[in-house]
């Protein structure tokens, strides 16, 4: 099992690593978003360093890259993310909050905060899922709060379902 050291920092789109910012801007252009930068509620970047690498896993899955970079951007309607591993080109994706199942939690198996996402990706008809990980510091928690606020605004009071009563209680 690999051990990781994660560092998350809040930043602006212009303060992201250049390859991540470029991937996000290219994604926004493909989606025909004209003023998405004005809609940014929060932005963060996480650097993950592999401290101990499982050699067998690295041979099978190619997970031996020492550094991985992740950028997350929260807007009022969607979550946008980009990642790059090692010296590879960054890739970006996004999804509307209304088209995703999003769970933000602290995994038992590792320290930090995780975003479990299952969503229909913007620009495709495909649904995909995955886990994005941040550290457990105050800047990561602040970003999670912004996402939580944005998603709560989309839930109408009538959409909140009452808890089920079990066994007639």
Residue map of PLM features:
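Pleckstrin homology
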Residues: 138-163
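Anionic N-terminal interaction surfaces
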Residues: 1-72
């Amino acid at each position: 099992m690999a051990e990781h050291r994660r560092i998350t920092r809040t930043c602006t789109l212009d303060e992201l690593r250049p390859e991540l910012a470029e991937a996000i801007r290219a994604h926004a252009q493909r989606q025909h978003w004209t003023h998405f930068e004005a809609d940014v509620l929060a932005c963060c970047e996480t650097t993950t360093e592999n401290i101990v690498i499982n050699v067998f896993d690295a041979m099978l899955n190619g997970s031996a890259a020492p550094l991985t970079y992740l950028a997350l951007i929260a807007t009022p309607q969607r979550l946008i993310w980009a990642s790059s591993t090692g010296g590879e080109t960054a890739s970006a994706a996004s999804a509307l909050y209304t088209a995703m199942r999003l769970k933000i939690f602290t995994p038992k198996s590792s320290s930090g905060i995780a975003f479990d996402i299952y969503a229909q990706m913007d620009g495709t008809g495909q649904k995909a899922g995955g886990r994005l990980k941040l550290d457990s510091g105050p800047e990561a928690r602040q970003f999670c709060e912004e996402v939580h606020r944005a998603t709560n605004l989309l839930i109408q009071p009538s959409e909140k379902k009452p808890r089920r009563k079990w066994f007639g209680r």
